[in-house]
């Protein structure tokens, strides 16, 4: 817990008012016992990977996850290719539409990997440019997703 407090304090020190008090834990995983501690240490949001069970895992904390990871971790640990990444995105959107997952949770796309390649970057740029004009698509900023002002 001390590292979480230090991390948020350091972000505030460096980024000031631009800091969004949302924890994205290493490897997008967190021990359930830590979750109730987060609001007391200044965190207003949590983002992990996969479908959330609830939007409020503890009082004072909003959880909004990512659902599409374009990196193939099981095989070559690199960009899985546009086809497979789009299949994952479409699968999540289908699950939302069919009510298999929380339809109120925005679809999250992981883009923070240290092993990012030009091919992955080009995919993200193309995805953004081709979807941003579609009437059913709205790209959101983290502060808007978590209802925080920056």
Sequence positions of predicted segments:
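An active-site-proximal "capping" alpha-helix that borders the catalytic cofactor pocket
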Residues: 1-11
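Active-site-adjacent pocket scaffolds in enzyme catalytic domains
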Residues: 21-103
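Well-ordered, non-membrane alpha-helical segments in soluble/globular domains
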Residues: 4-5, 82-94, 121-130
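C-terminal domain-boundary segment and adjacent tail
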Residues: 45-46, 50, 101-150
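The substrate-binding groove and active-site-proximal loops of carbohydrate-active enzymes
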Residues: 1, 21, 77-80, 112-117
């Amino acid at each position: 817990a001390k590292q979480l407090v230090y991390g948020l304090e350091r972000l505030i020190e460096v980024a000031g008012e631009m800091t969004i008090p949302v924890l994205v834990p290493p490897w997008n995983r967190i021990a359930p016992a830590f979750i109730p501690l987060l609001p007391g240490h200044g965190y207003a949001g949590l983002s992990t990977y996969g479908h959330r069970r609830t939007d409020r895992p503890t009082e004072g904390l909003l959880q909004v996850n990512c659902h599409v990871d374009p990196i193939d971790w099981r095989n070559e640990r690199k960009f899985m290719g546009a086809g497979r990444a789009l299949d994952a995105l479409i699968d999540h959107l289908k699950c939302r539409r069919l009510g298999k997952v929380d339809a109120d949770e925005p679809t999250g796309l992981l883009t923070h990997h240290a092993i990012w390649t030009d091919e992955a970057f080009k995919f993200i740029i193309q995805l953004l440019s081709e979807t941003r004009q579609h009437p059913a698509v709205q790209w959101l900023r983290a502060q808007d997703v978590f209802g925080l002002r920056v």
